[in-house]
């Protein structure tokens, strides 16, 4: 693991930075107590918020870089965070205001750069010099008034924008707020973070959360904090409490023990209407819901709230009682479309299943007809799948909807034979069949979409929405839970029966060489990344038993866990992408696409394969598409700019009207992030985080900025 860069502050740097942000408050307690401005002064030259603007459309009016000259783009500067490690990722969409860029490293250090040169101005280490305990995924920061707000694990920090130091008075003297507090569960026994930055409305920061997909898990409350003090102003319970609408769609005690239904992909604010829009994920555990019978409002829903109070305005549940990890993967996008010759403000929402939902903004009515389709209800004992699901009739899906034998790979006879063997073993009968024990389940589109967290881009001038799509099937097998050891009952669902990994989590066979017993026990208690905190589910002796097994591979006792409220009869035995014998997708290309959809009509304007596998391309097998993570930006003057592809490390520019490739370059690592564009001193730049690390691809830690010569 390479060490992360430590702060380097020369006098010249600090003087230059002070000139850039003159007028920002000093980090003393008295000034921290004053309410900061609700948002930075927006300018066409800036990329002032995550997603580019408050509508989250990834749209810019900057026009120096054009379809005619984009092919002449050159690297303007690079910034190596020196923080990449095996498996690390860097998904930040940088914020740029007044010539300063703010973003994060793979180890979640926050930094500020001169956006014209890439020169570091300050850097903040939230972990006090300690190495990271696990991989982190983080998509950016909020810059507002005198402060930079970002999340590290359960800590929500407010940093002084000028110096990068925590602001006393935000959450007390520490300069951070504990996101585990205020959820109705013991704070030290749950795991809560926020991979996507929140939004600013007036004097509030409104934010979703990332919680474990296994049990125990925290509830996914949407919360608003005072920008000045970090005080919690309001919460919206996505798992309703007694007396709240939607409570009847869960078991009676679900509000005490259920988790998930969280807006991990971010939230969007309409400041003129004082409305907050959120898109939520599934309830935990993802694949077996006997503990959460019912439709599970407000999981898998688009929710509109009063941004000042958190009061419910409207909601629409896209998927009832999710059993396939089909979270809504991106923040809602605010768009204006044409209906009967008149402009109508709307909310667009992409899904992992490859659908685009379009809702009238104030009341939430779908703007295209919706079909209610009957679903199979055969399931494991205790499970009660929803008997029907909703589907928009338009736009048509941007991903294939069902896997058949005709869709299996024909890359080579051997690849087809391997894929056919797997297909016949799983024998899928319906894209919404409940996960089972007897044969397993093929989830298609897969758990990474369809659409993913990069989200779409939207051109308000044409009404076209642009979205990259993954075309990967995933394999899932459940098995009865084994109570022979606490490890088998608690951990094997992700890490395999013998610590070998392969069921959605990494191998732990060598964890004793990487961590001390105390570190492992702390991780079990407090959680780490997507792993839940087990402090609420077991006592110290139970955690010690699991630690001993992880360190030695030997079962030291046979304590049972069936009495736990988090105990389920079934767990994950296998969970991975459907691949052939050589590690390529087991289905026919395209394995990833880039799509343009007209939201005025619901029709697809164009769709092209997106991405390549370099080894296959060298054999003449080109234009296959690959999975992609990160989104596009669209320019008023005709460009669609996107990196995102996992294996070819390319950054591309397309003609937004036709999908024609205009320019491409190879990055130091995959740009699994959304780029930002901005202007400093009369020059337009485009910057992308090159973090890699997805699905076994090499990791990186470099930001690369491009400009015209």
Locations of the language-model features?
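Bacterial N-terminal signal peptides that target proteins for export
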Residues: 2-14, 532
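Extracytoplasmic electron-transfer domains, predominantly the class I c-type cytochrome c fold
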Residues: 193, 485-558, 689-690
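Bacterial signal peptide processing site
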Residues: 25-28
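Repeat-blade elements of multi-bladed beta-propeller folds
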Residues: 47-51, 87-109, 133-156, 190-216, ...
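C-terminal motif of bacterial Sec signal peptides marking the signal peptidase cleavage site
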Residues: 21-23
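Extracytoplasmic/lumenal domain signature
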Residues: 68-82, 110-131, 156-189, 221-257, ...
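Periplasmic c-type cytochrome electron-transfer domains
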Residues: 53, 399, 406-420, 424, ...
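Mature N-terminal segment immediately following signal peptide/propeptide cleavage
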Residues: 37-86, 94-96, 119, 595
